[in-house]
Amino acid sequence: MADLVKKHFYKITLTIPEEFQEMSSALLSDFPFTGIEDEFDEQSFTIEDVYWDNGNIANQLLSILESTSIPAEIKDIMIIEDQNWNAIWEESLEPVQVNESIVITPIWKAHQIESPIKIIINPQMSFGTGYHSTTRMVCRKLQEYVGANSHWIDAGCGSGVLAILAEKLGASYIYAFDNDEWSIANTKENIHLNNCSSITVEQESIFSINLPQVHGIAANLYRNLLIPNIYKFAKALEDSKGVLIMSGILRFDEQEIIDCAVQHNFIHISTEYEGDWTAITMRYNA
């Protein structure tokens, strides 16, 4: 019997500012990558050698990003041997203690966890695990502001962690949306894992959606998505004079976000910091 040919992969690491990474992932989604890794101001794209095309693919990535004014440069290219990427990645994930009462845990370690509030997820490599510092900060703010029988929006729900937490904290209706079909599928899966029944999930773009009236909004989005849509958040909070919790914001964008929200009749309540990231809480006050 002939030996199986072992696959090789190329890992292309680009320097891309954090606030552009969601957009770059979307723009490059048609390429047959086996994995995408997001780090601070870096993204790595892994592709099988059969698609390498003598290195032309790296220049194609840069050309696409430059055409949309996303600043990017090639930092590193390396050849790596075939591995069980998903198994390696899963082994690296540990339950995350958000605070003394909230834990986010991958499903394969859920049986090890005892916590007043346990959020079980089946993390997906393609769009995030819900473990980012911005998610943790919003979780802590939700614990402050979600009231019994309140209504909430999870804008850009990703894996659905924030929507699930809102229900566990007592919200009776949560509207969660994302423009990514895989995020929607994963959110629905995680809703089922947590036995939630008060969450409505839809695939929608934040630029075209009409938001319902609610008591609060959790928007863990990048600056370029928050600023053009703060007016929508204001409209959704008109009746309740509710709270808007925003994250996905780098420290140097904090004041610009606050100023924009103030122009739409929000008042600033607080700002939290974790590393280079911030979470800003505002209240509608027209």
What are these regions (language model features)?
Residues 5-113:
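N-terminal auxiliary segments of SAM/dcSAM-dependent transferases
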Residues 26, 62, 136-139, 143, ...:
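Amphipathic, non-transmembrane alpha-helical secondary structure
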Residues 29, 164-167, 230, 234-235:
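A structural alpha-helix within SAM-dependent methyltransferase catalytic domains
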Residues 34-35, 73-76, 103, 151, ...:
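Conserved beta-strand segments of alpha/beta enzyme cores
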Residues 85-147:
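SAM-dependent Rossmann-like transferase core, predominantly class I methyltransferases
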Residues 125, 129-210:
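Conserved SAM/SAH cofactor-binding pocket of Class I
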Residues 179-286:
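S-adenosylmethionine
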